[in-house]
Amino acid sequence: MKREHHHLHPRPDPPSMAAAPNGDTYLNTGKAKLWEEDAQLDGGMDELLAVLGYKVKSSDMAEVAQKLEQLEEAMCQVQDTGLSHLAFDTVHYNPSDLSTWLESMITELHPPPSFPQPHPSQMNDSSFLAPAESSTITSIDYDPQRQTSSLIFEESSSSDYDLKAITSSAIYSPRENKRLKPSSESDSDLFSTSAIGASNSATRPIVLVDSQENGIQLVHALMACAEAVQQNNLNLAEALEKRIGYLAVSQAGAMRKVATFFAEALARRIYRVCPENPLDHSMSDMLQLHFYESSPYLKFAHFTANQAILEAFEGKKRVHVIDFSMNQGMQWPALLQALALRPSGPPAFRLTGIGPPAPDNSDYLQDVGWKLAKLVETINVEFEYRGFVANSLADLDASMLELRPSEVESVVVNSVFELHKLLARPGAIEKVMSVVKQMKPEIMTVVEQEANHNGPVFMDRFTESLHYYSTLFDSLESSPNNQDKMMSEMYLGKQICNVVACEGSDRVEWHETLTQWRTRLCSSGFEPIHLGSNAFKQASMLLALFGSGEGYRVEENNGSLTLGWHTRPLIVTSAWKLGNNSVVVTH
C-alpha cells in the first residue's frame, strides 16, 4: 500500500501540482532562484525556513525569537508543578505557521484565571495517545529537470514514525531544574512538537513529538541539500546539511542512521573532504565480517556462487578456483565440505586468492591459506593454495597464475562485490575480462549490488543511493545482535560516503544493475548460465535463519538470482561462460 503525502511541500500554502506522464502527482520543490521568487510572492517569507516547511516572514523573525524566549521561560517556570494544566484537546492546526503556533503554546502555558479546569473524565481520556499508522520511506522519485519531487511512503512494520510519547524523566532531570536552551543554529528545532497534553498518570507530563512530520521534512531537506550541491549553491547546501542533523535526532531506527550517514557524506562533498583510505583493507575486512553475521546478503552471495561452482566441478578430478575477492576466505569452507561429500570422492582443490595490500604490509592472504589448510586436513581433501597481492584486478596477468591445461585442471573464476571497482579506470574492466578469457574457465560467478550508482548526474546518483541504502538499513533492524548491526551500519556508511562524497579515482563504489552488467559481459564475449532451481530453493531456506525470512525475497531474473528486502532487489548473483564465438587473445 502506497500513500502520497501532499503536504510535503516546503510552503504551508496549498502547493502547485503537476501531473507526471504515468499519472503520479509531483510536488513542486523548486530551485534556489524559484525559492527567492516564491518568497517575494509570499510576502517576504524567510527562504531557509520556507524550504523546510515553516511559514515565517523575514520581518517577523525578531517577534518569533521573542516568543521563543517567552515560551522557554514559561516552560521552565512550570517544571515544578508539571504541565498538567494544559488542555489535552487543544489542536494546533498549522504548526508550520511558527508565529501563531508559538502564540497558542504561550497562551496555553499561561491560561487566564477564568478558564474552567478540565473535567476529571476528560483527564482520564487517553485516546490521544493511540498509535498512529506505521510507515517508512522505501521509495523516492526525483526529477531535477521538472524541478519536482514525489515522496512516496510504503507501509512497513520495521520502522516507526508514530507520535512518540516521552515522559518527563526523559526531558527533565529529576535532580536538577535545568533551563531549556534552544539551538543556536535554529531556534525552532526545540519546538518540533505537534501537541502537548497531560493525563492523571504517574508519568506526567507527556510531550508528543511528531516524528513523522519531522521525517518528511528530513527527507525533503536531504533532497534539497543534494540539489543545492549539484547547483553549486554551497551556502544553501551548508545550511541545509546542518538542518538535516537536527531533524535526524527526532527519528528512530533506520531512518535516523541513514540520514546521519548521508548528512556526513554531503558535508564531505560540500567541504571537499574525501574519506581517507577508501581501500583500507583491514578495516573493511573487520566490518565485512560483522555484515556477514548480521544479515543474509553475503551468505546468499557465497551460497549461490558455491552452488554454481559445485555443479561446474561435477565429475572433475582436479579443480582450480581463482578468487578475485579473497578477503578472509569465508566463502570456501562450505564448498570444500560439499566437495568432500561427493559420492565419487573429493577432487584435488587448488585455490588462488587475490586481494589488495594490507596497510601494515602484513601477509594476511597467507594467514587465510593456513587456516583453510587446517580445515582440509580434517576432511581429507588434497589442497593447494597461493595468494596474490594486487592494487587492482587490472594489474593481473594470466601468466602469473600458473594455469594448467584444461584437460588436466578445470578452472572457475569467482568475484563477489569486486568488478564494480574497476569502472573507475577507463578500459580496466575490458582488460580483466580479456585475462579471464585466457584462463578458459568452466564458469565465472559474479555477485554485485543491484543498484545504479554510476550515473553522470549527481542528483540521480544521490536519489538512487538514498533509496538503496534506506532499504538496506531497514532490513538490518531485524538483526538480533546489536554489535554486529552497529558495525554493519558502519560498513554500509563507508560505502555511502564514497558514493556521495567522492569522484574520479577516489570513488570505488561504482555500482551497476544486472542489466548493465549483462550488456558489459556479453559485449566482452561471455554468455549467461542459468542458475539451477536447487540454488533457488536452498537460498530460500537460508533466509529462514534470519527472522523466519520475513521481509527477505529471493527472485529469479533471467537465470540470475536476486536477494532483496520486500519488493526491492539489493544484490544479484549471476554465472557466465565463454561464448561460442569468443576470441581469446594472448599477450
Curated annotation (Swiss-Prot):
The gene is GAIPB. GO terms for cellular component: nucleus. Residues 501-577 are annotated as: SAW. Probable transcriptional regulator that acts as a repressor of the gibberellin (GA) signaling pathway. Probably acts by participating in large multiprotein complexes that represses transcription of GA-inducible genes. Upon GA application, it is degraded by the proteasome, allowing the GA signaling pathway. Residues 411-498 are annotated as: PFYRE. This is DELLA protein GAIP-B. It comes from the Eukaryota. Pfam families: DELLA (PF12041), GRAS (PF03514). The DELLA motif is required for its GA-induced degradation. GO terms for biological process: gibberellic acid mediated signaling pathway. Residues 209-577 form the GRAS domain. Its main location: nucleus. A motif (DELLA motif) lies at residues 46-50. A motif (LXXLL motif) lies at residues 419-423. Residues 367-399 are annotated as: Leucine repeat II (LRII). Residues 1-23 are annotated as: Disordered. Belongs to the GRAS family. DELLA subfamily. Residues 288-353 are annotated as: VHIID. A motif (VHIID) lies at residues 319-323. Keywords: Gibberellin signaling pathway, Nucleus, Phosphoprotein, Repressor, Transcription, Transcription regulation, Ubl conjugation. It is found in: Nucleus. Phosphorylated. Residues 216-270 are annotated as: Leucine repeat I (LRI). The keyword Metal-binding does not apply. PANTHER family: OSJNBA0084A10.13 PROTEIN-RELATED.
